[in-house]
């Protein structure tokens, strides 16, 4: 993959794994990430909370080659490693003077800066995610609705509701169903947390 394609991939897979907003992705700092043997750990946006994105292993039901292709932690590690050269990749800007993770290549029309990579903003992150979703055949969602698209697709594909709620960190089925659920099974009311039908 080219660096730009790897950026799209890393950003999109991380967005699906961690569900940040595009503005959080744009402000994501390199010093918040720590590589681990089993994945990556990062400080959650604006807090001191540590979260981990594990590397895919056998429990996902995918072959080894497929796991490597869709693993968010591996894609993010590869992107951070590839964009470490500060002579080509300008990690900071005047608005947020820290080392950004995601960058975009400057178009040829900018002369001396041609080919250089600069930090991206929230709109670029959103556009990248929307483009990846469109290429994957997921239409009707904005770049900021990766969490909603993933959860709705999971419901459509028969993933248990309690697993969808837990994985997506939804506060309740009612909130998810009322405001975010776009699945074909919207009218289905699960028995999450109930012990009887009464």
Task: Kindly give the residue locations of the regions a language model identified.
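N-terminal core-binding DNA-recognition domain of tyrosine site-specific recombinases/integrases
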Residues: 1-4, 120, 140-141
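Short, charged phosphate-coordinating catalytic segments
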Residues: 15-41, 86-90, 160-166
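Catalytic-site neighborhood detector that most strongly recognizes the C-terminal catalytic loop/helix
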Residues: 167-193
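C-terminal secondary-structure termini that scaffold catalytic or DNA-interacting sites
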Residues: 194-198
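Active-site/catalytic core of tyrosine-dependent DNA strand-transfer enzymes
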Residues: 64-138
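Short, basic (Lys/Arg/His-rich) helix/loop patches that form interaction surfaces
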Residues: 122-166, 185
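Basic, Lys/Arg- and aromatic-enriched nucleic-acid-binding interface segment
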Residues: 1-22, 70, 147
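Conserved tyrosine-mediated DNA breakage-rejoining catalytic core shared by Y-recombinases
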Residues: 27-73, 78-81
């Amino acid at each position: 993959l080219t660096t730009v394609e790897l950026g799209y991939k890393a950003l999109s897979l991380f967005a699906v794994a961690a569900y940040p907003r595009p503005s959080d992705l744009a402000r994501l700092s390199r010093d918040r990430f720590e590589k681990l043997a089993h994945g990556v750990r990062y400080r959650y946006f604006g807090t001191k909370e540590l979260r981990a994105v594990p590397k895919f292993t056998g429990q996902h039901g995918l072959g080894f080659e497929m796991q490597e292709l869709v693993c968010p932690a591996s894609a993010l590690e590869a992107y951070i490693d590839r964009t470490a050269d500060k002579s080509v990749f300008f990690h900071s800007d005047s608005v947020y003077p820290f080392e950004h993770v995601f960058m975009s290549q400057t178009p040829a029309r900018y002369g001396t800066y041609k080919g250089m990579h600069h930090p991206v903003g929230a709109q670029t992150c959103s556009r990248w995610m929307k483009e990846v979703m469109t290429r994957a055949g997921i239409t009707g969602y904005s770049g900021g609705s990766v969490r909603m698209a993933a959860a709705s697709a999971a419901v459509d594909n028969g993933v248990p509701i309690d697993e969808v709620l837990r994985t997506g960190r939804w506060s309740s089925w009612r909130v998810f169903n009322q405001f975010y659920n776009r699945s074909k099974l919207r009218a289905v009311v699960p028995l999450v947390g109930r012990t009887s039908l009464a």
